[in-house]
């Protein structure tokens, strides 16, 4: 029931690669599901800023990130369990159905058994269903929700 998201970037320096590998191995030792956490290649802001890229370029970069971790995980005898978009990509997918659909298709091409973690009750969950990919509703402990999993941060208690 526990998950660990690992970020892989193009041209990672050796220390970052070692940390990624260590995180992967630690998750395996502790029987924690491993997930890829791909994002825009925005090192300066750690993927928290939307980048205006050609869709093919973005999908190629996301494919690299997911496949790099998938290959590393499989080299340790484990399997990649899920994919969770990171930062601005996560938010952009909730508001841009074309982006979400391209992302879902990409994940399905890589491995149709991968689950996609996304905002609870969002349009991304519906698109996952449309493409026969398991979408996992996600909530955040530091946000307030009502019983429908709708955010209500705007209310003060």
Spans of features found by a protein language model:
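Glycine-rich tight-turn/loop motif centered on a GG-T
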Residues: 2-10, 44-59, 94-96, 110, ...
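Active-site beta-loop-alpha junctions enriched in small/polar residues
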Residues: 5-13, 39-45, 86-90, 119-121, ...
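Glycine-rich anion/phosphate-binding loops
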Residues: 8-25, 53-68
